[in-house]
Design a protein with these regions (language model features):
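N-terminal maturation segment of proteins
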Residues: 1-466
Length: 466
């Protein structure tokens, strides 16, 4: 369905684009043998050619009147500049040395000191010769094209843009519902969340309740004391044993986004491990975005247990057909991660009332982003319309609203993967409660959806209830 719309796709979105993701993927390229080092260095030499192909694609988009908004181009140009300006402090230098050290310690004698020095020199040369020039090339190409875009608004302003958005949403979320049905589903959930929050806030006039009321407007960090990611992951892995199926023993490494790149990467992300080595896992934390301990706790649930890391490792332990590891079902993976994140509020040391307030509030905010995505790209909202919508819900900071608007323009349907995927899991759960009655348990439901693995929701429904 999406094939006629190839030029509507955008490989260079902020946060999720190739320019952001490639360096991280390169820095996580594992060295198991000497040949892996050679292959990695060869990959570096291909970067200019790869970026040239992206620029050719952007030129074709421009000629068809489909180039990105000028402010999106400006943001990507600035990101590329900052990346190049890191020079010798760029993490592609340090991560290479670390990976050589890991190989040398894992396989004694496989790498001599002389070889390590030679490979390090070669890597240093290649970064300067291939990586930085590729980014310079991107800066130059995007600067030339930046004002050639015909549309600074949503997809519906492009020819057949609404039809494309319908296909895109179906592809990104795995949901077969129409946009109107999705809007209705989101509005219903937001109303439910707000009603529950209101009930918690007004249901008890005791001192406990008044402290909740004051706490929700203060930094969330006052509520949780634990700030060590490894201890939090350990806590989370212990909390899921009752309601989630067991998973194999694994090793997880916590890494941190380089400070100078914090603005350009997500608050945290899980690196999907090699298909034949799921025991080694990496989670990146972006301290620039995670400013309090509750956010850290719920984010580590989203990236770790019982979300991305757990789901990947558990599914791999079932030995699925390898093709399943290549197929991309963002609605399932991000929906499951959001469902898990929402559940994690109740795994924390918060009181039940506090957990309910923060979880429902988080759900509402994500729901508003999802409605704004559909409003902007399907109903044609401009910035003023989006601002009016957010103002209705008490979000009045115009700079924040503009940032949200710009992100939604640059990456259509991205928020829907998370929120609609989450709502589809909630709908599946309601169906399971109705169909299984007294035989429903959290464990049975979780095992059923995890055993099916990433797929569209109509397929999951079919297999869970067959």
């Amino acid at each position: 369905d999406l094939s006629p719309y190839t030029l509507y796709d955008e490989p260079l979105a902020p946060l999720t684009g190739t320019q952001s993701q490639l360096p991280v993927i390169l820095s996580e390229y594992r060295f198991y043998e000497i040949s892996d080092i050679e292959n990695y260095l060869q990959l570096l030499t291909k970067t200019p050619e790869y970026f040239r192909s992206i620029l050719n694609f952007e030129h074709t988009k421009s000629e068809s009147g489909l180039f990105m908004a000028s402010y999106t181009a400006d943001s990507i140009i600035k990101e590329c500049r900052d990346f190049v300006n890191l020079k010798e402090s760029n993490y592609l230098y340090s991560s290479f040395v670390e990976r050589l050290e890991e190989l040398a310690s894992a396989k004694d004698g496989v790498l001599t000191e002389k070889q390590r020095e030679a490979y390090t020199r070669q890597n240093n040369v290649y970064i300067k010769k291939y990586i930085f020039p590729a980014y310079e090339q991107l800066i130059s190409g995007l600067s030339e094209l930046r004002s050639s875009g015909k549309n600074n608004n949503g997809l519906c302003y492009l020819p057949n843009g609404r039809t494309y958005y319908e296909y895109l949403v179906r592809s990104e979320t795995g949901s077969s519902r129409s946009i109107a049905e999705l809007q209705n589903l989101a509005n219903t959930q937001i109303l439910s969340d707000l009603t529950v929050m209101q009930r918690v806030l007004t249901g008890d006039s005791s001192s406990a309740s008044s402290s909740i009321t004051s706490d929700i407007f203060s930094p969330q960090g006052t509520l949780l004391t634990e700030s060590d990611p490894e201890k939090i992951l350990s806590t989370l892995s212990g909390k899921i044993t009752k309601d989630f199926p067991p998973y194999p023993q694994i090793h997880t490494q916590i890494k941190y986004v380089q400070k100078s790149m914090e603005d350009y990467l997500s608050p945290a992300f899980y690196m999907i491990p090699a298909i034949d080595n799921t025991s080694e896992n990496v989670i990146y934390i972006n301290n620039g975005h995670l400013t309090d301990n509750l956010s850290l706790f719920t984010t580590l649930a989203h990236e770790g247990y019982p979300a991305h890391l757990y789901q990947n490792v558990y599914y791999a332990s079932l030995h699925p057909d390898p093709i399943r590891c290549v197929l991309n079902y963002g609605g399932y993976t991000e929906g499951w991660a959001t469902y898990s994140e929402m559940m994690s509020y109740y795994f924390s040391t918060l009181t039940k009332e506090q957990a309910t307030l923060f979880q429902r509030n988080s759900s509402v905010i994500l729901g508003l982003y999802a409605l704004a995505d559909m409003g902007i790209h399907y109903d044609g909202w401009k910035l003023a319309d989006a601002a009016a919508f957010f103002h209705t819900y008490g979000i009045t900071d115009d700079a924040t609203i503009e940032d949200i608007y710009d992100l939604i323009i640059a990456d259509p349907a991205n928020y829907l993967k998370y929120y609609i995927g989450y709502l589809e899991f909630l709908e599946l759960k309601k169906n399971a409660v109705n169909k299984w009655g007294d035989n429903f348990t959290q464990m049975r439901f979780h095992k059923a959806v995890l055993d099916v693995g990433p797929a569209s929701f109509d397929v999951i429904q079919k297999y869970v209830f067959k």
